[in-house]
């Protein structure tokens, strides 16, 4: 085979793979996702009554008001474009001091010790869920701030607790955004 033929073969193969992998494959799977899973393919967006996007059920948000359940801390301040962990080792003094400060602030605001998920950052920095126990330790504060019966808030937490995927994978969890939106929907 001459060098010119080899170059021609290389150019054709490059074009075939570029069209196949760069165009056909993404278009086919994007089309499939739009048909089979339209909500997830578009970011699992959460909208308010005016159809405005207020978040995603897959990305955590920072809630600081006493009227809301608080999610996990974020090492990236909930900025999705910077998603990732802090990479601090469990023995790192900066991490230990941050966790101690977060735990003290939580205890001052809630009158009880936090669960571990409420003071440790998730790997992505964007986890939208907390554990049911993490929600339970915040129930008294939220019910007091909203002037609701604690049992009413506990019932709502239970209603928004998601089980394990397929009954065996992962742990039970509570989506903080969904729970807080449900709280806003309560009429007294």
From Swiss-Prot:
Signal peptide start-end: none
Location(s), subcellular: Cell inner membrane
A Pfam family recorded for this sequence: KdpC
Topology of this chain in the membrane: Single-pass membrane protein
Residues annotated as transmembrane: 13-33
InterPro entries: KdpC
GO molecular function: ATP binding; P-type potassium transmembrane transporter activity
Main localization category: membrane
Alphabetized UniProt keyword annotations: ATP-binding, Cell inner membrane, Cell membrane, Ion transport, Membrane, Nucleotide-binding, Potassium, Potassium transport, Transmembrane, Transmembrane helix, Transport
GO terms under cellular component: plasma membrane
Free-text function comment from the UniProt entry: Part of the high-affinity ATP-driven potassium transport (or Kdp) system, which catalyzes the hydrolysis of ATP coupled with the electrogenic transport of potassium into the cytoplasm. This subunit acts as a catalytic chaperone that increases the ATP-binding affinity of the ATP-hydrolyzing subunit KdpB by the formation of a transient KdpB/KdpC/ATP ternary complex.
Subunit-structure text: The system is composed of three essential subunits: KdpA, KdpB and KdpC.
Stored NCBIfam families: kdpC, PRK00315.1
Family to which this protein belongs: Belongs to the KdpC family.
Protein name listed in UniProt: Potassium-transporting ATPase KdpC subunit
Species annotation: Gloeobacter violaceus (strain ATCC 29082 / PCC 7421)
């Amino acid at each position: 085979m001459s060098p010119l033929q080899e170059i021609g073969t290389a150019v054709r193969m490059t074009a075939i793979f570029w069209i196949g992998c760069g165009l056909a494959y993404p278009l086919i799977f994007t089309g499939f996702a739009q048909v089979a899973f339209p909500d997830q393919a578009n970011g699992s967006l959460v909208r308010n009554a005016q159809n405005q996007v207020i978040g995603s059920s897959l990305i955590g948000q920072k809630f600081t008001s006493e009227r809301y359940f608080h999610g996990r801390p974020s090492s990236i301040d909930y900025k999705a474009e910077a998603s990732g962990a802090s990479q601090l080792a469990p023995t790192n003094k900066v991490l230990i001091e941050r966790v101690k400060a977060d735990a003290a602030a939580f205890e001052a605001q809630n009158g009880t010790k936090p669960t571990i998920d409420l003071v440790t950052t998730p790997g992505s920095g964007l986890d939208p869920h907390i554990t049911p126990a993490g929600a339970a330790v915040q129930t008294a504060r939220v019910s007091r701030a909203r002037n609701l019966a604690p049992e009413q808030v506990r019932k709502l937490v239970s209603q928004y607790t998601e089980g394990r995927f397929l009954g065996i994978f992962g742990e039970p969890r509570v989506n903080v955004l969904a729970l807080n939106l449900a709280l806003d929907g309560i009429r007294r």
